[in-house]
């Protein structure tokens, strides 16, 4: 145990799926430690993650990071970790129906993130990107032309239906943090696609900018705790995976 109220176990050199959890913890001002980023002599490094995956944190075996420990509770899977933390850190409404709605939307983000990953690893996670480049080009073509407009258009309609400025209308929640991360990641990975789509997802873009300027998030983004995007994480920028600029399909209304 590190003495922190929350211990996050995730790969120390990438944002990845763990970044959704980091953003929530940062926004809440939570007492947490990113365990694998500690020195090895303090229990950090990749070995910390391997200990978690061996079940040394509790009675249940996680499949993969991120893993969160809060006292005697150990939770894995990004969406479930957020579902667990949201009520504890006052980042989700008390209404159980709204909590389910937020969880549903977060699971939709999980689907999107999986599709982002498959643009650079469409065949096998065990192969290098260079071994599946041709297939990645085909996968990314369909993703940028069809799937990005579909997902982001859906979230645009969610915000519009709620009346904005947040996904739940006037109520800020951890879902808004996750939407920010999605927009940031897609802007990094597929900048031309996002630029051409921007006029049709104005509410989502405004939400992302509002999250960026929240005091704790702004401080986090300016700190070394916020790892940069790179070609090891979920959102990767390979210029060859983005076709020359053209208008994506119209956002469904």
Sequence positions of predicted segments:
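GST-like fold's C-terminal all-alpha helical module
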Residues: 97, 104-213, 253
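GST-like domain detector, emphasizing the conserved glutathione-binding G-site
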Residues: 2-139, 167, 238, 245-253
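Short, contiguous strand/loop micro-motifs
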Residues: 7-9, 194-195, 219
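Generic, ordered loop/turn and secondary-structure boundary motif
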Residues: 21, 76, 92-93, 113, ...
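Long hydrophobic alpha-helical segments typical of transmembrane helices together
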Residues: 203-253
